[in-house]
């Protein structure tokens, strides 16, 4: 897995190693050991999936302590432009944003 930092601390682009041939492809979308070694120690407690029709804009979602949680976002079909905005008061990147294309072709994931 290749880990790419973004302009916002704690927001990372993850690029898995994809193994493909004429049958299709395979990649490890998550490994607790690799994640702990390259990103941070985390316990994922929830897994969600959503479907959006073409042209849909999803809202900005966030949680405040004590309900804050990290998210690992990926796309299995099509593509999205995922935008993360730093709304943490006191953060040196407060108000800044990063935009990342996530798609079935690039297999990128965004850790927020």
Regions found by a protein language model. Give the residues of each.
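Non-catalytic, conserved peripheral segments adjacent to functional cores
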Residues: 1-108
């Amino acid at each position: 897995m290749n880990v790419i930092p973004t302009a916002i601390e704690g927001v990372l682009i993850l690029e898995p190693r994809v193994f493909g041939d004429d049958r299709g492809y395979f990649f490890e979308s998550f490994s607790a050991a690799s994640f702990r070694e390259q990103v941070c120690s985390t316990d994922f407690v929830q897994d969600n999936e959503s479907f959006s029709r073409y042209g849909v804009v999803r809202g900005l979602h966030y949680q405040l302590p004590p309900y804050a949680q990290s998210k690992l976002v990926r796309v299995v079909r099509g593509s999205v432009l995922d935008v993360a905005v730093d709304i943490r008061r006191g953060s040196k990147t407060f108000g800044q944003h990063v935009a990342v294309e996530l798609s079935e072709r690039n297999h990128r994931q965004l850790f927020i």
